[in-house]
């Protein structure tokens, strides 16, 4: 995919990346389907280490197996057997790890955690709140279903309300 007129978005990603080395960053990227959100982030990080978690419509345990393999491959960290591991356990592990090294984590189709296990959002809130002040993490989440992304991040009754440090809406 070729990128045209994404300099503004790349500059914003660069600023966020730089900040994340000092203080934890939580960025939301929204925009309609097939507009290039995923490819834009992947292109920006093509020469940097980035964990990429795609939230497929699978069981949580199956997703965790895939996420653990991504951690092993990209960070070269031996991790215990992932059998029975939850996303909360993996996210906590990453947040703990980010206290000693910078990590960029990109979670794609973030709204689909609703189908996997809606309590993941509460778990993330608790873990984020407990670790963000000591972490050097660049957490990027992207979603294509605006109604769900708005519910997750803009509804005062939802656990991740107000947690983001940046929001990017990608237009054609």
Outline where the language-model segments fall.
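Phosphate-binding site recognition
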Residues: 1-172
């Amino acid at each position: 995919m070729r990128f045209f007129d994404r300099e503004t978005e790349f500059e914003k990603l660069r600023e966020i990346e730089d900040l994340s080395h000092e203080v934890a960053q939580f960025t939301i990227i929204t925009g309609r389907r097939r507009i290039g959100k995923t490819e834009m982030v992947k292109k920006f990080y093509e020469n940097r280490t980035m964990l990429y978690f795609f939230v497929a419509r699978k069981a949580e345990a199956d997703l965790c197996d895939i996420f653990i393999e991504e951690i092993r491959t990209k960070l070269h960290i031996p991790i215990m057997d992932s059998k029975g591991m939850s996303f909360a356990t993996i996210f906590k592990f990453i947040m703990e790890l980010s206290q000693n090294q910078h990590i960029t984590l990109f979670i794609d189709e973030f709204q689909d955690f609703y189908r996997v296990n809606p309590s993941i959002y509460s778990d993330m809130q608790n873990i984020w709140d407990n670790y963000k002040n000591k972490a050097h993490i660049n957490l990027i989440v992207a979603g294509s279903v605006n109604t769900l992304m708005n519910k997750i991040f803009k509804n005062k009754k939802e656990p991740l309300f107000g947690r983001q440090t940046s929001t990017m809406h990608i237009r054609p």
